[in-house]
Amino acid sequence: MNISRTTFAGFADATEQHFIDRTASFLKANVPALAGVSDVELLSNVQHVVGKARSYGFVEESDVVRFALCSALLGLEFDHDFPGAREILEMKESATYRADLLEYYTREIFEALEG
């Protein structure tokens, strides 16, 4: 049995859309600031952010979701608006290590704001 390229691409697109849907649901459930955002807008933003994460070399779902969470907390353009985040993203380290650093960086920002 051979699967055509078109069929395979369709499966890949469906899998990516399912991931975007799950990521949007996770963000809406865990980021109170997103409560008032419509599902259509959120899905559009998540699709954009997932594309950005991939452009920085994030492949693993957990790394992409952490990138998306940082974006939800710091803003859609956090990678340009926060020099520290930009520095982390431009590092030559592994994607998982950079996702760890982004998560830590974001926590540090919020802890500084709370304290």
Language-model segment annotations:
Residues 1-115:
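A contiguous, surface-oriented mixed alpha/beta subdomain in the mid-to-C-terminal portion of proteins
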